[in-house]
């Protein structure tokens, strides 16, 4: 047999065994179970899906005949050779081919051909492996099955600890973990009512009437509306942040710090802590004011007969009693915080009953107003605390005698001829109704403002009065503080704070992402309605002089809002006292825990001591610091002076919440996927502007102090964490900012929630330096929602000195294409002697500092089967191995020419994700990013995962739906059951054909090398420029062999070659005795089974994403690996094979 003839027959064998196209051999499909009747991929797969499992184990004479004919036509071997494989297949057809028939394998070659796995357990039995997922078994330790992880992923939520503690707890073995009680609180009990309790507070009962009387109904309505708009816009921003992942215990501080980073987070967290601490002081002062002024006035320790000094005595009383109250409350919190929580519902009931009493009283006043007369001297309001009758004289035993009022304004209380105050002499004493009622029309008088300086007498403008001034008497009702619009804003704003009570309880909520937005916004709407309606009701029911009487002196010392309530003023007094005490306890409970959370984050080193707690978890040191700061507020002693301080810190906090939402929305990071949809950066910016305006409106100097404190904290945290880099002039500002940002990014790998795809797109160039597959760039541009880095790279094979000009020309070509496809990024070309080395250099060295790629995008080598050169697929697998070694993600687009351009838009369709193994969550993130682009926007996401026989598919579906809910990704979920089934004869035959083809190609490459060596040498030496695209690299062994052959053809070499050809012929004869390697059979079984279910479910999908199995550890199985991937993806129009980089890229946390 002469060598040329042998070569010809070998070539015929290769094309006969693996036809490159179905049309090449009519009626013959290289993947169909019925090898004689399939003609198209669509028909082939639909038919295969319909073939019953039992039919594949029946005798298949057609298949065996086809196999025999293929071999016979190729080589015409002796009959004993041809009959052997047929007998084997017929024998196998009588028994389903499973792992139990391992005796059919050629034991002498089994281990050598087992390129994927060398495991002792394999020979003992197949139970060690999952038959249906054999393709993925090598990496099960790093990429576990989805079914084994779903339950744990779905139950990440509702944790009682913070994210940091949760990450630490994940390292504890399951046996050591304490069972956590599942939170059961819903929207009403968990968010709505706590928000109501925290928003309604002391200001409503003690100051709202005074605000209405001083500012007038219109301006008071504007104050309340502005404050409510501020909190509503903040709540919208907070809802977006809160629903952007699971918010463990830590609430608002956790949200802000994780959304804005440690510097802003620490600054805002401390502002929020100080606000909560001063809130405790304000509530305590409010409770003391109710206690000393309205409940037990005689309990006052300090007194003064001078009207101007009486307020100073009252402040001293507040300091003494406030300190005592603070110590008592701290002891209650220290000893038993659980009692505070138990009585919270009682305190809330007090608030609700008090508010209902106000509405009931307002309604009743329209037909039966309560009797609260107000004594007036001219148009001046008199205090009724010490007078017996509202007149200058009174009758006793038919005798007219001076009244007590006479004695207050005259130098003698016994005689009518005494010297009296001039104003008292010229004006009459009259009594007016303090609560005229809803139908009286008094609102017309109360519409306008009446701002007064401190010490002025409260007057009724519409009453008649002489122009005589008279002397100032302490029996008049005086203004105790200079009033203005800005002051009232600062005093009222604390009454709308407390909107974060729901997010603070996020760890106790059954579904925080649903409950927090609904509960918080409903609570704000409720409280806003109450406040706005009360402004109107107070102005319509109560006399103006009574409204401006802060402490109720004109109505016998009653609480002004209590005079309107029904059935008794005591309902409001007692209810407001207990609710204020309860709010103070809640603040003293929450503030230390907030400080503890900040201290545990360790962003402010000097606060580290406050992160410690006693045995039962109570933050003792933090409680003591909170009490000390609250004492500072109590020493101020005035509710009207503490409230603006409180406003500053809360406004600062709300400002940064709005800033966080606006920044996240504008930056559009991949992790920004709020389940709450009704937000916009403009709303957040408006909320931020209102917060800033309110800070300076209420008190510009307090605002500056608060901002300086926040700025100092920010700079301190930044100083502790990193050096500050300054620019060197205006011209270098951009460079300095970029350098500083790169140095900051260099500090470490990004947090999971900050991960975004930084793409390295590997392009193929043709001989004319044009991009072969521009759709690969189009696809990269459609992922630009990730807002990450894009580097477009390619390799020119040759010498850098000779090919530098071509590299520049190719770079310009690629840049023009990038502009056309609207890809914002960088282009980098490498000139290398070998393509694989060039690709490796690109993957290793592209990028700078933290701006390095984390994902490689490349196309599938479509012509690898047709190519006689192994370079077509060896470069591809080499690239896969390099990306895996570099811990980079890999995206392989198959049939890239079918991918849509940027001008095409799908009006409907599905993006199908087949989640087989978990390798970091790339499969979840990619379809979300694609849907941000107009091309894919109208497509729906469907996520499929595979259940085995031992899996609970119903529970898996629930867990997967829960997991996606927490990821804020809207997708249809389906669990596909793949029960263990016998390996079909078709799978066995497909594996056999694959291995025969590999063996024949190996022999043919050897023969072809010998035949063409002289011509190849001439070609290699004369080629000045070799531009080789990715997927067609030189094989290293071939090149080495060619470089060694420099001699001309000799007789000795001719004889040696004849011996090698003889061995080659023997190898071909052995092909007919081959029995497929069992590990390859099992992998082919996985590919076939998965392909069946994928094509059945996703044959009409616009895009299919699925896990890409890893390459074999033993390079001998590389070609089989390519075949497995081909089988896995056959019959699908657009496929994206995804291989994660080994780190998590998506998280449920905020």
UniProtKB/Swiss-Prot annotation:
Q: Where is this region: Disordered?
A: 20-66, 161-181
Coiled coil ranges (UniProt) are none
Q: What, per the annotation, is the impact of changing residue 1048 to A?
A: Decreased phosphorylation by WNK kinases, leading to increased potassium-chloride cotransport activity. Increases Rb(+) uptake
> Which residue intervals are annotated with compositional bias (Low complexity) in the record?
28-45
Do the record's keywords include DNA repair?
no
**Residue intervals annotated with topology Extracellular:** 159-165, 246-263, 317-433, 488-518
Q: Where does chloride 2 bind?
A: 151, 443-444
> GO biological process: any one?
angiogenesis
Describe its PTM?
Phosphorylated, phosphorylation regulates transporter activity. Phosphorylated at Thr-991 and Thr-1048 by OXSR1/OSR1 and STK39/SPAK downstream of WNK kinases (WNK1, WNK2, WNK3 or WNK4), inhibiting the potassium-chloride cotransport activity. N-glycosylated.
Q: Does the keyword tRNA processing apply?
A: no
Which residue ranges does the record annotate as region Scissor helix?
Answer: 682-691
Q: Which domain of life is it from?
A: Eukaryota
- Which tissues does the record link to its expression? Expressed in brain (at protein level). Highly expressed in heart, brain and kidney. Detected at lower levels in skeletal muscle, placenta, lung and pancreas. Detected in umbilical vein endothelial cells.
Q: Where are the Cytoplasmic topological domains? A: 1-135, 189-211, 455-464, 546-568, 613-629, 666-1150
Family membership, please give it.
Answer: Belongs to the SLC12A transporter family. K/Cl co-transporter subfamily.
The name under which this protein is listed is: Solute carrier family 12 member 6
Q: What is the lineage of its organism?
A: Eukaryota, Metazoa, Chordata, Craniata, Vertebrata
Its gene name is SLC12A6
């Amino acid at each position: 047999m002469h060598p040329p003839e042998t070569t010809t027959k070998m070539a015929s064998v290769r094309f006969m065994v693996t036809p490159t196209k179905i049309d090449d051999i009519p009626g013959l499909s290289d993947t169909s179970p019925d090898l004689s009747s399939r003609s198209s991929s669509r028909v082939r797969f639909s038919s295969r899906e319909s073939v019953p499992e039992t039919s594949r184990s029946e005798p298949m004479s057609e298949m065996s005949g086809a196999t025999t004919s293929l071999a016979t036509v190729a080589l015409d071997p002796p009959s004993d050779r041809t009959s052997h494989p047929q007998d084997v297949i017929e024998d196998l057809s009588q028994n389903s081919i499973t792992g139990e028939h391992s005796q059919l394998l050629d034991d002498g070659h089994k281990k050598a051909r087992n390129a994927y796995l060398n495991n002792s357990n394999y020979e003992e039995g197949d139970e060690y492996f999952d038959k249906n997922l054999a393709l993925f078994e090598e990496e099960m330790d790093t990429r576990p099955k989805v079914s084994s992880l779903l339950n744990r992923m779905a139950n990440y939520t509702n944790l009682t600890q913070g994210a940091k503690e949760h990450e630490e707890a994940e390292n504890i073995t399951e046996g050591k973990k304490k069972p956590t009680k599942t939170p059961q609180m819903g929207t009403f009990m968990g968010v709505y009512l706590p928000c109501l309790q925290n928003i309604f507070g002391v200001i409503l009962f003690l100051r709202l009437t005074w605000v209405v009387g001083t500012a007038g109904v219109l301006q008071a309505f504007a104050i309340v509306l502005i404050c409510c708009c501020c909190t509503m816009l903040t709540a919208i921003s907070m809802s977006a942040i809160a629903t952007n992942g699971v918010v463990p215990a830590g609430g608002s501080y956790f949200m802000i710090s994780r959304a804005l980073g440690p510097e802003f987070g620490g600054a805002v967290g401390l502002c929020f802590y100080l606000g909560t601490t001063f809130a405790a002081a304000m509530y305590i002062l409010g409770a003391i004011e109710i206690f000393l002024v309205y409940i037990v006035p005689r309990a006052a320790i300090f007194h003064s007969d001078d009207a101007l000094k009486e307020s100073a005595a009252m402040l001293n009383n507040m300091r003494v009693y406030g300190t005592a109250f603070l110590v008592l409350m701290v002891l209650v919190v220290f000893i038993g915080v659980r009692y505070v929580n138990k009585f919270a519902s009682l305190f809330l009931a007090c608030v609700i009953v008090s508010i209902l009493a106000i509405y009931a009283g307002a309604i009743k006043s329209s037909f039966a107003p309560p009797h609260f007369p107000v004594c007036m001297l001219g148009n001046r309001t008199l205090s009724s605390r010490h007078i017996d009758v509202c007149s200058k004289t009174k009758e006793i035993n038919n005798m007219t005698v001076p009244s007590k009022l006479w004695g207050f304004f005259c130098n003698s209380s016994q005689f009518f001829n005494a010297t009296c105050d001039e104003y008292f002499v010229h004006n009459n004493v009259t009594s007016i109704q303090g609560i005229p009622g809803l139908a009286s029309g008094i609102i017309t008088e109360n519409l306008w403002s009446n701002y007064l300086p401190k010490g002025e007498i409260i007057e009724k403008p519409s009453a008649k009065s002489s122009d005589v001034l008279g002397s100032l008497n302490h029996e008049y009702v005086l203004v105790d503080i200079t009033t203005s619009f800005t002051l009232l804003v600062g005093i009222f704003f604390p009454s709308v704070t407390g909107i974060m009570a729901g997010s603070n309880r996020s760890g106790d909520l059954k579904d925080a992402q649903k409950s927090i937005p609904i509960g918080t916004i409903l609570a704000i709407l409720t409280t806003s309605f109450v406040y706005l309606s009360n402004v109107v009701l107070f102005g319509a029911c109560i006399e103006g002089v009574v409204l401006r009487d802060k402490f109720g002196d004109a109505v016998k010392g009653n609480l002004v809002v209590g005079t309107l309530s029904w059935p008794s003023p005591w309902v409001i007094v007692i209810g407001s006292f207990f609710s204020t005490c309860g709010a103070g306890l809640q603040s003293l409970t929450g503030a230390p825990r907030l400080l503890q959370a900040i201290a545990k984050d360790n962003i402010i080193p000097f606060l580290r001591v406050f992160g410690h707690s006693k045995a039962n978890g109570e933050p003792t040191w933090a409680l003591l610091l909170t009490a000390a700061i609250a004492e500072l507020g109590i020493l101020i002693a005035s509710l009207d002076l503490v409230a603006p301080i409180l406003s500053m810190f809360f406004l600062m906090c709300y400002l940064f919440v709005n800033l966080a939402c606006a920044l996240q929305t504008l930056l559009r990071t991949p992790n920004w996927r709020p389940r709450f949809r009704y937000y916009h950066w403009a709303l957040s910016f408006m909320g931020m502007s209102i917060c800033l305006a309110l800070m300076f409106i209420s008190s510009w100097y307090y605002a500056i102090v608060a901002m300086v404190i926040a700025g100092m904290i920010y700079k301190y945290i930044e100083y502790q964490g990193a050096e500050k880099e300054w620019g060197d002039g205006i011209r270098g500002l951009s460079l300095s900012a970029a350098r500083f940002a790169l140095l900051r990014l260099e500090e470490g790998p990004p947090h999971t929630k900050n991960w975004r795809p930084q793409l390295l797109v590997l392009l193929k160039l043709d001989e004319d330096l044009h991009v072969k597959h521009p759709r690969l760039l189009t696809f990269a541009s459609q992922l630009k929602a990730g807002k990450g880095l894009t580097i477009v790279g390619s390799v020119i094979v040759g010498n850098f000195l000779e090919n530098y000009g071509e590299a520049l020309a190719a770079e310009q070509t690629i840049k023009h294409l990038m502009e056309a496809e609207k890809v914002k990024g960088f282009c980098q070309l490498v000139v290398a002697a070998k393509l694989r080395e060039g690709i490796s250099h690109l993957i290793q060295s592209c990028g700078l500092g933290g701006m390095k790629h984390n994902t490689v995008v490349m196309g599938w080598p479509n012509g690898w089967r047709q190519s006689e050169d192994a370079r077509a697929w060896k470069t591809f697998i080499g690239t896969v191995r390099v990306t895996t070694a570099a811990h980079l993600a890999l995206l392989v687009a198959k049939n890239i020419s079918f991918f849509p351009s940027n001008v095409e838009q799908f009006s409907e369709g599905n993006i199908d994700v087949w989640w087989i193994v978990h390798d970091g969550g790339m499969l979840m993130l990619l379809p979300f990013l694609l849907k941000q682009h107009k091309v894919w926007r109208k497509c729906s996401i469907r996520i499929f995962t595979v259940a085995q026989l031992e899996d609970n598919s119903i529970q898996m579906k629930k867990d997967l739906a829960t997991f996606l809910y927490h990821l804020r990704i809207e997708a249809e979920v389906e669990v596909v059951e793949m029960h263990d089934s016998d390996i079909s004869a078709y799978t066995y035959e497909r594996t056999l054909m694959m291995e025969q083809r590999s063996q024949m190609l190996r022999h043919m490459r050897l023969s072809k090398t010998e035949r063409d060596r002289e011509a190849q040498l001439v070609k290699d030496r004369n080629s000045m420029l070799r531009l080789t695209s990715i997927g067609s690299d030189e094989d290293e062994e071939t090149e080495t062999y060619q470089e060694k052959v420099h001699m001309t053809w000799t007789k000795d070499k001719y004889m040696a070659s004849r011996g090698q050809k003889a061995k080659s012929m023997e190898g071909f004869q052995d092909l007919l005795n081959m029995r497929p390697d069992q590990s390859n059979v099992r992998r082919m079984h996985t590919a076939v089974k998965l392909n069946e279910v994928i094509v059945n479910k996703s044959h009409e999908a616009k895009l299919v994403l699925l896990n890409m199995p890893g390459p074999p550890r033993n390079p001998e199985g590389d070609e089989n690996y390519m075949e497995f991937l081909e089988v896995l993806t056959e019959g699908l129009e657009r496929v994206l094979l995804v291989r994660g980089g080994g780190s998590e890229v998506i998280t449920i946390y905020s």
